[in-house]
């Protein structure tokens, strides 16, 4: 698991983890993992939860969480989904980094 950060020296590790879909953890409540299941739906609204359930059935391979809420995931077919729902400012900042998922190596 890569140790990452949303600022400073760990930012390079965060970008690497997101572009290569590698497990990572920050010192806070932001992490990603290779998985085919979901640990928690957190604060997802019904629309986002339904999308997540559909994608889990289709097959997922990587999920990014902020405060136990999935904020982005990558399906086995390579499709990246970033939730559209608004959250706190902190989770909003976390969501901002998920664009790197689409820059997969």
Where do the PLM segments sit?
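Terminal leader/tail segments of proteins
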Residues: 1-105
